[in-house]
Swiss-Prot record:
It is an enzyme of class 2 (transferase). Catalyzes the reversible adenylation of nicotinate mononucleotide (NaMN) to nicotinic acid adenine dinucleotide (NaAD). This is Probable nicotinate-nucleotide adenylyltransferase. NCBIfam families: cyt_tran_rel, nicotinate (nicotinamide) nucleotide adenylyltransferase, PRK00071.1-1. SUPFAM superfamilies: Nucleotidylyl transferase. It catalyses: nicotinate beta-D-ribonucleotide + ATP + H(+) = deamido-NAD(+) + diphosphate. Keywords: ATP-binding, NAD, Nucleotide-binding, Nucleotidyltransferase, Pyridine nucleotide biosynthesis, Transferase. Its EC number is 2.7.7.18. Pathway: Cofactor biosynthesis; NAD(+) biosynthesis; deamido-NAD(+) from nicotinate D-ribonucleotide: step 1/1. It comes from the Bacteria. The lineage of its organism: Bacteria, Pseudomonadati, Pseudomonadota, Gammaproteobacteria, Oceanospirillales.
Length: 219
């Protein structure tokens, strides 16, 4: 067996409301896959996000828009397991489901933005997240907020400085990763533009724009 065949699978979960999906989400997923040399990035729309208001557009429609946005992009996939599951969309449960599918040796990563990371200690079963996966924080050059004591305690001794070290084990470590492209695009601003009737051209993929306008979503 050659070395490439022997390498454990590398898979990331990138969750969110995707309300709606935009170029920032998709570019981050592509660059995350490249930086970590991942086999797949599972983009997981939340049905009932635990830490924010439930979106006004259904989870099924948000997932359909996400599929339009991904198109035929290699290595990116819509994962609807949180939509199929009743109750709050807890990341720990999603990671447990992925871990069961992938097996104990797969390198499983949960990627999240820096703002979400600052509240990680308040998430459902935060310790279990590290039992199941690595956490990669998509870093921001302008962040300067100190970590809360509970978060410092949660991540103590887990930080690694490079991808090679991260991938030596199936789970349990924390890596801050600065991606090459940081787009100042927010789903909130896109929803506001749609309500005003302003253009969202080049903020979302063309297929997503067509579907949003045809259905009058967020208008």
């Amino acid at each position: 067996m050659c070395a490439a065949e022997a390498r454990p699978a590398r898979v990331a979960m990138l969750g969110g409301t995707f309300d709606p999906v935009h170029m920032g989400h998709l570019r981050s997923a592509v660059e995350l896959r490249e930086a970590l040399e991942l086999d797949r990035v599972h983009m997981v729309p939340a049905r009932v996000p635990p830490h924010r208001a439930t979106p006004g557009v259904s989870a099924e429609r948000r997932a359909a828009l996400l599929a339009l946005g991904i198109g035929d992009t290699p290595g990116l996939a819509v994962d609807d397991r949180e939509i199929a599951r009743d109750g709050p969309s807890y990341s720990a449960d999603t990671l447990a489901s992925l871990r069961e599918e992938l097996g104990p040796q797969a390198r499983l990563v949960m990627a999240l933005g820096h703002d979400a990371y600052l509240n990680l200690a308040e998430w459902h079963e935060p310790q279990r997240l590290f039992d199941l996966a690595h956490i990669v924080v998509i870093d921001r050059p302008d962040h300067d907020r100190p970590l809360a004591p509970a978060l410092q305690e949660l991540v103590a001794g887990r930080e690694v400085s490079d991808v090679e070290t991260l991938m030596q084990a199936p789970a349990g470590s924390l890596l801050a990763l600065r991606l090459p492209t940081r787009m100042a695009i927010s789903a909130t601003s896109i929803r506001e533009r749609l309500r005003r009737g302003d253009s969202i051209r080049y903020l979302v993929p063309e297929a997503v724009e067509r579907d949003l306008l045809a259905r009058g979503l967020y208008a």
